[in-house]
């Protein structure tokens, strides 16, 4: 588990628990025109999200013309920020907080929470709760980004509409006590907006300008806007492409696939058939030489003594499952 429940009373932020519980219902409201959802439900379009995401992607396209004019250090910095933000999602919100596939000591949890704010993909609590719903109710109406509704919906469209009522109702029934018990999760949620402004936009922009004299214009569009847009789309490919394209050597009866190209961009998160078959496995991929920087990072943290109790599917368990339900592709 991410953190001991006994820590909950040691910090003056207990009211954050109530804010989190209130957040469970925050996606229900909203007005605006409606569109058909799954099984005929009408879902309100969130026009603010449509406009902001459209502007973000237009900004990213414009950023491409600035690349030849930027200093090489700025491009390296943007890539470093991409990797840092990615770890906040993959090693943090996903493998640590959503699946509890390993334990992390307080310094590592703080680092991952800060990195997660740089990713700006919802706070740890909401991300983890929705991801647990995605696994428990995969590709049903209770799945926040149900791939059965098509590539566009599972990639980005799910962010353009209010959550399906099944996502809200089933989400309330999930056990999230471990998330509520972790002060790092509560504090990050309480101060999420300011942490996102600082970590996703201010810090990535100011470092190139202040340290090696990059223009603020180039710094903002390359290290913030372009980097953030690429980061979002690579993460979304796990929800879309990795549920549609690839083989299924572990379970042919589920939609998630092995997609090495997604794994390459998402630092190890594309071995999705394996992950949905063995969600408790901290590596999210089978033994071997798979490209999985997130696993390498967790292993390094264990070597430093900052992470422990890595959970792993055994080789006999994996082979037995492949023989029973795999598609014989591996």
UniProtKB/Swiss-Prot annotation:
Binding-site positions, Fe cation 1: 94, 99, 131, 135, 275
Lumenal face of the membrane: 71-72, 215
Entry keyword set: Deafness, Endoplasmic reticulum, Fatty acid biosynthesis, Fatty acid metabolism, Iron, Lipid biosynthesis, Lipid metabolism, Membrane, Metal-binding, Non-syndromic deafness, Oxidoreductase, Transmembrane, Transmembrane helix
KW ATP-binding (keyword) present: no
Cofactor binding summary note: Expected to bind 2 Fe(2+) ions per subunit.
Any Pfam family the entry gives: FA_desaturase
GO cellular component term, pick one: endoplasmic reticulum membrane
InterPro entries (alphabetical): Acyl-CoA_DS, FA_desaturase_dom, FADS-1_CS
Subunit structure: May self-associate and form homodimers.
Disorder association: Deafness, autosomal dominant, 79: A form of non-syndromic, progressive sensorineural hearing loss. Sensorineural hearing loss results from damage to the neural receptors of the inner ear, the nerve pathways to the brain, or the area of the brain that receives sound information. DFNA79 affected females appear to have milder hearing loss than males.
Domain comment as written in the entry: The histidine box domains are involved in binding the catalytic metal ions.
Other facts: This protein has no ortholog in rodents.
Protein name from the UniProt record: Stearoyl-CoA desaturase 5
């Amino acid at each position: 588990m991410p953190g001991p429940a006994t820590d909950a009373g040691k910090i003056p932020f207990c009211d954050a628990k109530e804010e989190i519980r209130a957040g469970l219902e925050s996606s229900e409201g909203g007005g605006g025109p409606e569109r058909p959802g799954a099984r005929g439900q009408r879902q309100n379009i969130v026009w603010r999200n449509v406009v902001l995401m459209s502007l973000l992607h237009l900004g990213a396209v414009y950023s491409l013309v600035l690349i030849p004019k930027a200093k090489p250090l700025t491009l390296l910095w943007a890539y470093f920020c991409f990797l840092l933000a990615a770890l906040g999602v993959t090693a943090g919100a996903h493998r640590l907080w959503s699946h509890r596939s390993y334990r992390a000591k307080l310094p590592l949890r703080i680092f991952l929470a800060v990195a997660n704010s740089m990713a700006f993909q919802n706070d740890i609590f909401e991300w983890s709760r929705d991801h647990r719903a995605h696994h428990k109710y995969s590709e049903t109406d209770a799945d926040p980004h149900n791939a059965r509704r098509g590539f566009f919906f599972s990639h980005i469209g799910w962010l353009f509409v209010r959550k399906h009522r099944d996502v809200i109702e089933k989400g309330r029934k999930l056990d999230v006590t471990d998330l509520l018990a972790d002060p790092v999760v509560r504090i990050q949620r309480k101060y999420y907006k300011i942490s996102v402004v600082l970590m996703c936009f201010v810090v990535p922009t100011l470092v190139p300008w202040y340290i090696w004299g990059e223009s603020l214009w180039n710094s903002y569009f390359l290290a913030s806007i372009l980097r953030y847009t690429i980061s979002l789309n690579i993460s979304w490919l796990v929800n879309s492409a990795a549920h549609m394209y690839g083989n299924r050597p572990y379970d042919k009866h589920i939609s998630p696939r092995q997609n090495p190209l997604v794994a390459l961009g998402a630092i190890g998160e594309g071995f999705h058939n394996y992950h949905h078959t063995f969600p408790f496995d901290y590596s999210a991929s089978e033994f071997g030489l798979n490209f999985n920087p997130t696993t390498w990072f967790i292993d390094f943290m264990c070597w430093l003594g900052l992470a422990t109790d890595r959970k792993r599917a055994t080789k006999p368990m994996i082979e037995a499952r492949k023989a029973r339900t795999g598609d014989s592709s591996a």
